[in-house]
UniProtKB/Swiss-Prot annotation:
Its cofactor is Mg(2+). Belongs to the bacterial CoaD family. HAMAP family: PPAT_bact. It catalyses: (R)-4'-phosphopantetheine + ATP + H(+) = 3'-dephospho-CoA + diphosphate. This is Phosphopantetheine adenylyltransferase. It comes from Aeromonas hydrophila subsp. hydrophila (strain ATCC 7966 / DSM 30187 / BCRC 13018 / CCUG 14551 / JCM 1027 / KCTC 2358 / NCIMB 9240 / NCTC 8049). Its main location: cytoplasm. Homohexamer. It comes from the Bacteria. It is found in: Cytoplasm. ATP binds at residues 10-11, 18, 89-91, 99, 124-130. The gene is coaD.
Length: 160
């Protein structure tokens, strides 16, 4: 069995914090599946296909990473991908409580699914997709927080 991990998220948009975690996971695991969740209830800026394409662009240099969109329960996606490890990032102590609850629910639904938590590099510890969108909305420079392709995509969305 290969060492396959899923890194799920909405990735609206994918940030440098996400890509840092993906790159680090790619060094630890044989295969990393970036699972881009549909999450229509979150009212994303980018639709699912756009988020998948942006995530593919920023991870194209990582040969053992694939990006797949999904809907429904994460545990069903994990089974479909034949993965039994889930990776999640913890930016702050406040993230831990929520992630701990999710890990326990996922374990209850799929006992063989293990959750592994990674902390971000210090320079990425405060970056979130929500903050990036907020800074962009108010005309701030987001180039230090996202890949140039993502910054361009956000700018294009704003001019529509």
């Amino acid at each position: 069995m290969t060492n396959k991990v899923i890194y799920p998220g909405t990735f609206d948009p994918v940030t440098n914090g996400h890509t840092d975690l993906i790159g680090r996971a790619a060094k630890l695991f044989d295969e990393v599946v970036v699972g881009v969740a549909n999450s229509p209830s979150k009212r994303p800026l980018f639709d699912l296909d756009e988020r998948v394409q942006l995530a593919r662009q920023v991870t194209a240099h990582l040969p053992n990473v694939k990006v797949v969109g999904f809907s429904g329960l994460l545990v069903d996606f994990a089974r479909e991908q034949q993965a039994n490890v889930l990776i999640r990032g913890l930016r702050a102590v406040s993230d831990f409580e929520y992630e701990f609850q999710l890990a326990n629910m996922n374990r209850r639904l799929m006992p063989e699914l293990e959750s592994v938590f990674l902390t971000p590099a210090e320079e990425n510890s405060f970056i979130s997709s929500t903050l990036v969108k907020e800074v962009a909305l108010h005309g701030g420079d987001i180039r230090q927080f996202v890949d140039p392709a993502v910054a361009a995509a956000i700018k294009a969305k704003q001019t529509k």
